Amino acid sequence: MYSVNYHRASSVADAAKLMKSGDAKLLSGGMTLIPAMKTRLAAPSDLVDVSRIEALKGVKVSGKTVTIGAATTHFEVANDEKLKKACPALAHLASLIGDPAVRHRGTIGGSIANNDPAADYPAAMLALGATIVTNKREIAAEKFFKGLFETALKDGEIVTAVTFAAPAQAAYEKFRNPASRYAIVGVFVAKGKDGVRVAVTGAGDDGVFRAKPLEAALAKNFNASALDGVKVPASSMMSDIHASADYRAHLVTVMAKRAVSDAAG
């Protein structure tokens, strides 16, 4: 590690002000930033800690609308009773992230803002048609995730919450790396008033994406059997030491079938 100025923000407005200091970075759970700093892949002049801001914490459910504060930890998302009733699929997703240490420190806002191509939350946000709320505006998930580790966030913009309408049916299934527990392929399926959405993480060569062929099949028949013979093109899949593009394409359909079976269950 090296010399860095640490600031504990007292409010979102305070954090936005502190972010103007040199090359500042937001710190919440630190699950990505701190390892990056240790290996000198990131060298911010200032760290602005937002983990103690109460306005950024907690889960609220009002009717069918779910709102989750950006500093809410994975553990809190996984165990919130209101969320388990409104959208159990998202609570289940959070329970699959990392190990207990990661779940108690990592936050939903940090994961979304980082947009790791194998992270779980981006698939959920895309499938649920969520809105990403910042200190300056609201951004539809469809327009928020721009590619590998890229988002629509601008300098000084802070994710404060995510909000979405509770789906009628939803489920998440992932084939995970046994060491990191990141998704080699993760599929979130959600059925709501606007139809069926299927979002995939861990597989696409440009990050999280919607699997339109699977959505079209499920719109006609929301049953795992509707996906028999339906494939996504391997040409748009990433290939690495963990899985080939062809295998990832195969897993997308397999995980989608499992998710539909769970959701329809």
PLM feature segments, named:
Residues 1-265:
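C-terminal structural segment of proteins
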